[in-house]
């Protein structure tokens, strides 16, 4: 801010600065004054902003108290209607959310099945093929064991 008083060479305190009582010592005093002014300006801004917020919070508190004072008798009178209505709305919202979630799950299952049946190899298709092979193997083992027991029963 004080750069416009310096010479064209951009040096520190020149001869003119010394005549005005400046020099290096005067420049330090000026910077100290500017720092103090900036601190005072910041403090004033913070106090103004903080005071405004304090006033607004007081007004909001007063408005809340007034609104509760007015609304409490109305809520007490209508509570036999409002409480069941709120419960019904909550149940309806839960039903819609559940329905939507199950619908999305069904669509994803149908999409996976379509990809699997058309041979596009969806995620976990290898696991399904492995499980299918193990199930078929176990079914053959059960069939062979049953056939063996039938043959033993007929042979005895």
From Swiss-Prot:
Residues 2-42 are annotated as: Polar. May have a structural role to stabilize the lipid body during desiccation of the seed by preventing coalescence of the oil. Probably interacts with both lipid and phospholipid moieties of lipid bodies. May also provide recognition signals for specific lipase anchorage in lipolysis during seedling growth. This is Oleosin Zm-I. It is a multi-pass membrane protein. The N-terminus is blocked. It is found in: Lipid droplet; Membrane. The gene is OLE16. One of its GO terms (cellular component) is membrane. Residues 1-30 are annotated as: Disordered. PANTHER family: OLEOSIN, OLEOSIN 18.5 KDA. One of its GO terms (biological process) is reproductive structure development. Keywords: Acetylation, Lipid droplet, Membrane, Transmembrane, Transmembrane helix. Residues 43-114 are annotated as: Hydrophobic. Belongs to the oleosin family. It comes from Zea mays (Maize). The lineage of its organism: Eukaryota, Viridiplantae, Streptophyta, Embryophyta, Tracheophyta.
